Amino acid sequence: MQILLEDPAKAPQAEALASQLGQTDLPQFALVFTAARLELRKLDEPKLGAVYVDFVEGAVAHRRKFGGGRGQSIAKAVGLKAGAMPRVVDATAGLGRDAFVLASLGCKVTMIERSPVVAALLQDGLARAALDPEIGPWVRERMQLRHGPAVETLLGLTERPDVIYLDPMFPHKQKSALVKKEMRVFQSLVGPDLDADALLPAALAMADKRVVVKRPDYAGWLNEHKPSMAIETKSNRFDVYVMAALAG
């Protein structure tokens, strides 16, 4: 993988990232330091545009301001209500959108990301968000990132989180340009989510209160394990495994 500089002032960060990634055999991709951010570009499909993490502006910021607050399905799924601010581990962080929504609603969220490239994009997005005068204070307090394989990192947690959130990669039917672009980039970057079914037993072993699995509406249960309940949205479903109910 190439690391490119459009902003010479970012040379120290580029050198540090090159050292961190080592020999990553992804010749069709480049990580590009622009003046504004770190971007991932697919060199053989330039029309796909850049993939990057932005918590300050764009769709994520719009959702934070106008997305329905605690009335959102994801908030109900993790059990967020007055007086209850669950500690959440998002074991399949991706570009961090769902983790950011939960943090914006008051949850402390630890993100786990298996891909070193995606983790670098996330780290860059977190660093920029931390400097923002509006969201920076709570981003620094509520969001942290761990890079590593999801199952091993989950099983190695020293404290049991209230909620473990899973959104394993699944082939999308939706034709939205954003989903198509990101899914194509992600699938060629990290490959299929081969350990997706193994995530659920690990999460059930480590969560204190519940495990939430986000699925496309047409997908079956993860690991063919029936949830305690499901919360359905227009195109997705949150399968919720309530630990107290499972224990009973």
Swiss-Prot record:
Gene Ontology cellular-component terms listed: cytoplasm
Major localization listed first in the record, in broad terms: cytoplasm
Xref: Gene3D superfamilies: Vaccinia Virus protein VP39, YhiQ-like domain
Reaction(s) catalysed (UniProt annotation): guanosine(1516) in 16S rRNA + S-adenosyl-L-methionine = N(2)-methylguanosine(1516) in 16S rRNA + S-adenosyl-L-homocysteine + H(+)
Compartment annotation: Cytoplasm
Membrane-spanning intervals of the chain: none
Designated name of the protein: Ribosomal RNA small subunit methyltransferase J
Organism, as annotated: Aeromonas hydrophila subsp. hydrophila (strain ATCC 7966 / DSM 30187 / BCRC 13018 / CCUG 14551 / JCM 1027 / KCTC 2358 / NCIMB 9240 / NCTC 8049)
Gene symbol of the encoding locus: rsmJ
